[in-house]
Amino acid sequence: MPFTLGQRWISDTESELGLGTVVAIDVRMITLLFPATGENRLYARNDSPITRVMFNPSDTITHHEGWQLKVEEVTQENGLITYIGTRLDTEETGVAMREVLLDSKLTFSKPQDRLFAGQIDRMDRFALRFRARKYQSEQFRLPWSGLRGIRASLIPHQLHIAYEVGQRHAPRVLLADEVGLGKTIEAGMIIHQQLLAGRAERVLIVVPESLQHQWLVEMLRRFNLRFSLFDDSRYSEALLDSSNPFDTEQMVICSLDFVRRNKQRLEQLADASWDLLVVDEAHHMAWSEEAPSREYQVIEQLAEHIPGVLLLTATPEQLGQQSHFARLRLLDPDRFHDYEEFVNEQQKYRPIADAVTLLLGGERLTDDKLNLLGELIDEQDIEPLLKAANSQSEDSEAARQELVTMLMDRHGTSRVLFRNTRNGVKGFPHRVLHQIKLPLPTQYQTAIKVSGIMGAKKTLDARAKDMLYPEQIYQEFEGENATWWNFDPRVEWLLNYLVANRGEKVLVICAQAATALQLEQVLREREAIRAAVFHEGLSLIERDRAAAYFASEEDGAQVLLCSEIGSEGRNFQFACQLVMFDLPFNPDLLEQRIGRLDRIGQNREIQIMVPYLEDTAQAILVRWYHEGLDAFEHTCPTGRTIYDSSYQELISYLATPSEQEGLDEFIHTCRQQHEGLKLQLEQGRDRLLEMHSNGGEHGQELAQSIAEQDNDINLVSFALNLFDIVGINQEDRSDNLIVLTPSDHMLVPDFPGLPPDGCTVTFDREQALSREDAQFVSWEHPIIRNGLDLILSGDTGSCAVSLLKNKALPVGTLLAELVYVVEAQAPKHLQLTRFLPPTPVRMLMDRNGTNLAAQVEFESFNRQLNAVNRHTSSKLVNAVQQEVHTMLQQAEALVEAQAQALIETAKREADDKLSTELARLEALKAVNPNIRDDEIEALEHNRKMVLENLNQAGWRLDAIRLVVVTHQ
């Protein structure tokens, strides 16, 4: 093409320079000035990587002064172009704009514009873009979004609760599962779903101070959710940036004490527009109608301002009726406003639970029970169901299940309360206690005697705690460097035990970090035993590394030495040997220690080793835990209650272990209390609530469906392809692990989700669970979601040119592969993607206007194509530009019918689903007062807005690839 001064060209290799203007021409070279950057470039007149910029009728172009022109006519004179059309700001017609006056900052966003401007991408990027569109659309349609990407085992009851609650508008529920059943994971899954769906954007978690780091770790490791921990120093720091420090972060964890002791903080928290509040250990907030505690009032004030509330608490039976009512009152003060009324109502529900027990037991129903069922379900004619349920026919079981479902809908608190018990959830291992009685060394005997004399002024509580840890008493008198481990028989026993069990992974827990560190040194120096240490002094990354070292089968540590606090929130169910080097001071901590191994999914018996020194507080505490509470071999829901009621007597025995008069009677009394409370708890079991919380078949189906999605081959190949194209380094490790690190040539300098020093990932859920340092990559992982956004929100792969070597077709045959996207724009919380995700419609057009996409599948077609360099691509495009315009017009006419069909299907599906949900809630409200009015109103508004936005859905061209046939 001949060059003329003033012509506008664009660089094929440096498109960021904007539009260039020809400012100098000689025999062999031309000079382009790029006004947007002020830079000049010198190019050869022949075969330079530059493309002439020419617009067509119907394009909109921008003048360098900022106004826009809708092009209607294009003229050329002396090699320079003039565009004639309508000026959009003044609507003046017949306006002429010479090309030299075009805005130099011009960028091409439409795929066809980029193609004609020579901004052509590699064909592998085009393929990646199409796959990204296809897979993203498929993932949006799956109903369990937010549940798949969790780094946790697929436990049916957890998935059921999370799915039920996570789908709701502003859920306000009580999660009251027994210890070890995963309330934290349930809450995390609900948070994850609400965030992914756009129902929540700002989340506040309030927990006891000792659990802050545990929650921080759990949210990050299991759900890839980065919360900010607010304490005094972080609060002061944030106060410099904002009048309300809590506005500086979207997701915050803080302690209840941090809020309680400062009125201004509470007001700022309440004003910070949170969407979801999560409160752990909610049963510790005391309440009575006359005098609610300060802690309770704090949460009450927050719950009044925040639409969604999750309270994690002990089981209602452990709480007692009044305390249980207090939690429900936080969730719905209008519904639960009077305690006496609540008690009367609960008594009315007792017969419902009894009826369910009968139905589930398959027993024949007496006339009294039949009448009761008739009264409980009074608005429908259920005679045929009752008759079938009481018959011996094949329909009996189905009729009983239907009656149970009807009763469940009418159950008092089933929508606001979820509670599973170990009795109702299968899959827990047996626990076997091994008591190892060891002699008390003379060094300790002397230290304990001296301590008794010198510590006479200490409180009973302090003396009891001292007596549990004789090595610390010894160090108090002999100095911190005293080598207690040289004579403590527990150390010798531990060494022998580990040597005898070389093939087993062993978790050793002790109260103090210093003890763990000293034991590691002894194991290493005396028997060369590889041990990892895990304590509160380590950073999160250091803890992950220690846990990964312990988990590794190859060259990993045999032993993990944990301090009490350091082990919070970590689970090691790949091990089954637990050594308690000392004992914790209360039953909750004991259960927490055993809970590191005693989880659902543990498939071996847990061997609990307790080496203790005779004639010490340790010996008394072992007896009290085992004989009084049965707390080693079974979970102990009564432990805290008995501990609180017998605390003074217990610590007096621990503080003076030599005085054991009455100890046997004390332990016997505690055992009787334990058995009595256990019986009460069992009799108070609400089978209907357990059924509702457990999820039954629904939970099983969810777990199975998600398991089938695990190890998705499409995900693995897509992810590796994505990492290659984005420029992320990949290094294969053993055990299905890949190390990802940033490179110097990435598409973006900082890839969101990829740490600066890289990370280890796996696509295998089981591997991720056994390796603390490996992230579990699913379609929901931030690296994949951010990768999809990076590709699809930009121009990557939006236009390409390829060659098809096929002797069956004439040379020069032209095909246009077009990818349209049918989509609706709407606020994220409406979740339009459930019904109409951005859906790719692929077309393969020939010169005759025929769409060959149905006959030619994408992947097989893509494998036959060859890449073309950018310069040759530009030449090919310029040669067939007019034909491509015609093919695009033909495709536009064809795509409309497909797009409209997709939109109509989405509208029908949305109307059916949302109308059914609404009708069900309205019907339930008639028989169950726990359906909130605002929930029904929100669903009604949601349905209306979804249908309105679907009516405005449209389609656009997302990507184009020209394919030219060659025989060479």
From Swiss-Prot:
SUPFAM superfamilies: P-loop containing nucleoside triphosphate hydrolases (SSF52540). CDD domains: DEXDc_RapA, SF2_C_SNF. ATP binds at D177, E178, V179, G180, L181, G182, K183, T184. GO terms for biological process: positive regulation of transcription by RNA polymerase II. GO terms for molecular function: ATP binding; chromatin binding; DNA binding; helicase activity; hydrolase activity, acting on acid anhydrides; nucleosome array spacer activity. Its EC number is 3.6.4.-. InterPro entries: Helicase_ATP-bd, Helicase_C-like, Helicase_RapA, P-loop_NTPase, RapA_C, SNF2-like_sf, SNF2/RAD54-like_C, SNF2_N. A motif (DEAH box) lies at residues 280-283. Residues 164-334 form the Helicase ATP-binding domain. It is an enzyme of class 3 (hydrolase). The keyword DNA-binding applies. PROSITE patterns: HELICASE_ATP_BIND_1, HELICASE_CTER. Signal peptide: none annotated. Interacts with the RNAP. Has a higher affinity for the core RNAP than for the holoenzyme. Its ATPase activity is stimulated by binding to RNAP. Belongs to the SNF2/RAD54 helicase family. RapA subfamily. Transcription regulator that activates transcription by stimulating RNA polymerase (RNAP) recycling in case of stress conditions such as supercoiled DNA or high salt concentrations. Probably acts by releasing the RNAP, when it is trapped or immobilized on tightly supercoiled DNA. Does not activate transcription on linear DNA. Probably not involved in DNA repair. This is RNA polymerase-associated protein RapA. The gene is rapA.
